[in-house]
Amino acid sequence: LSSLNYNGAFLYNGTWVKALETIRNNNADLRWEKKHEFNVGLDWDVLGGRLGGTVDYYIRRTKDALWDYEVPVPPYMYPTMLANASEMENKGLEILIRATPIQTEKFTWNTNVSYSTNSNKVVALSSEKFSMDQDYFYTGYTGEPIQTTTHIVQVGKPIGTFYGLKSVDITDDGLWLVENKKGEHVLAEETDATDWQVLGNGIPKHYLNWNNTFNFFNFDLSINMRGAFGFQILNYQRMYY
């Protein structure tokens, strides 16, 4: 798959013709990502269908995930190439309970509660043909004025992992104190990349949803409540100060 773009022009038979150039390396082996999934579930109903639910467990593995890998120049024209080489695994449980607590000629109340949890991890970042120098890379970006990454993607760790210096206090002079790799509290300016650590994860581990529908003659009322639990939020603005 080649990508071309116009760049300049040249004179041909007395006419100026726009020139085309390749803007990224061609990868003839580029293909769709593959997903393999194992799923087992249970559906149940009692009381004439007024109470029921489902339970579903799955293991999902995504292979041949896409990423830009470094390649030598030459023989390639550009230093990176989009290729299928990564692999990720997800495991999860989904539970739904539905009920009709009240059902009369004039009024009906339907309700359902759902819960889901999912855990994922990076299984591989390299293949036989495309590889990285290490089993991780940094991603995410805060922009001005800090200019630093915010996440790490590493084999064996989940997607969405926050990675950086762990702030623990501020000195009387207003300088940041952080925790180094030995667990000591030192000035931020005295640290290096080896002192960075996992700070949390921005992807919720648990979701809970409660939906209610009320029917009274020709009127309907729906109320839905949804919650996400077991995650951290990156205070992007506070990182500036």
Question: Which residues fall in each region the model found?
Answer:
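Active-site proximal loops enriched in glycine and acidic residues that flank catalytic Cys/His/Asp
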Residues: 56-59, 223-229
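Outer-membrane beta-barrel transmembrane strand signature
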Residues: 11-46, 52, 139-224
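A short local loop/turn or secondary-structure capping micro-motif enriched for an aromatic residue
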Residues: 62-63, 186-187, 230-232
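Extracytoplasmic gating/loop element in the C-terminal half of outer-membrane beta-barrel translocons
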Residues: 228-241
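Extracellular/periplasmic, surface-exposed regions of secreted and cell-surface proteins
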Residues: 1-146, 150
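Beta-strand elements of well-folded, non-transmembrane domains
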Residues: 99-103, 216-218, 227-229
